[in-house]
């Protein structure tokens, strides 16, 4: 028979809301949940990040505040009268993305020339971060590190920005450039792109692999509790040094990759490698990932790692209805 069917309309999708009660648990399963949380925070509605138990890594709000976001976004929510332990996510937070180039080029005398911000039109990695954070996840961006609550991105930190992070400014960095900036700021961490004695252009490598969850963490629990170990990273980098006090979050398993663009030598080094750490000690307040989280703005599967890392740095008091 004819197996082809005419498609003349997009499928209808809607939120799933079950249960009864004064509180609503928003499952942290998609980017739509992040958008819903940020929309609620923008409206001044209290949102809690659940820290433990069955709903760890999910979000809690009052049931009265759920209807608007359930209609605007496609989310999964469960109503209940039992409010799980949660911390309030700070509202009004601004995120600064580092890595912008100067507005103009300059010659050896310091004289500026060129078209204003032309080079940043070609600054793809900066654009991916900004687009992913603002447009795809709903975070508000800041024009400078000074006016931001947190610094987030794959770009190199300036000397002043790195000093702020070293002094405790919240930071989420990903990729070898970002990790190297923190190393240069004084954190005992290193990120390698080389195949040992055979340096390569491994910054162009990527892999869709499986990860081992090395420790319990609010950054990773939404994936860990659902058995979602798939993890994409562009860059091919590996954390070859980490502070003893850092919490080890993710490492690549020895399983065959689902997809990989790497030399055979690099594959063997990449397997078992450390990919993410949480540095909350001695004044540091940072989460670091060895590889990309926003590459080409298509890594939506990894965005919940990024959002959870951001939220984990900006928690306030206990959530209560």
Locate predicted features:
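Intrinsic-disorder/low-complexity accessory segments
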Residues: 1-321
């Amino acid at each position: 028979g004819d197996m082809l069917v005419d498609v003349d309309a997009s499928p209808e999708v809607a939120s799933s809301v079950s249960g009864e009660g004064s509180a609503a648990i928003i499952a942290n399963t998609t980017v739509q949940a992040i958008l819903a949380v940020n929309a609620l925070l923008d409206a001044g509605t209290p949102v809690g990040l659940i820290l433990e138990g069955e709903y760890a890594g999910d979000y809690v709000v009052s049931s009265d505040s759920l209807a608007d976001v359930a209609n605007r976004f496609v989310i999964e929510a469960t109503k209940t009268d039992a409010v799980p332990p949660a911390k309030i996510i700070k509202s009004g937070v601004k995120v600064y993305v580092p890595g912008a180039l100067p507005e103009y080029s300059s010659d050896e005398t310091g004289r500026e020339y060129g078209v204003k911000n032309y080079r940043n039109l070609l600054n793809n990695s900066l654009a991916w971060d900004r687009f992913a954070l603002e447009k795809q996840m709903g975070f508000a961006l800041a024009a400078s590190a000074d006016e931001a609550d947190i610094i987030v991105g794959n770009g190199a930190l300036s000397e002043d920005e790195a000093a702020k992070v070293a002094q405790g400014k919240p930071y989420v960095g990903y990729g070898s450039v970002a990790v190297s900036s923190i190393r240069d700021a004084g954190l005992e961490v290193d990120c390698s792109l080389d195949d040992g004695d055979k340096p390569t252009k491994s910054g162009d490598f990527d892999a869709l692999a499986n990860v081992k969850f090395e420790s319990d963490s609010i950054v990773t629990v939404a994936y860990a509790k659902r058995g979602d170990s798939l993890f994409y990273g562009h860059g091919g980098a590996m954390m070859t040094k980490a502070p003893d006090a850092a919490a080890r979050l993710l490492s690549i398993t020895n399983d065959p990759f689902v997809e990989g663009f790497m030399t055979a030598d690099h594959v063997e080094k990449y397997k078992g490698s450390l990919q993410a750490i949480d540095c909350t000690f001695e004044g540091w307040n940072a989460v670091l990932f060895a590889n990309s989280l926003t590459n080409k703005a298509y890594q939506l599967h990894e965005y919940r790692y990024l959002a959870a890392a951001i939220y984990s740095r900006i928690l306030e008091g206990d959530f209560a209805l």
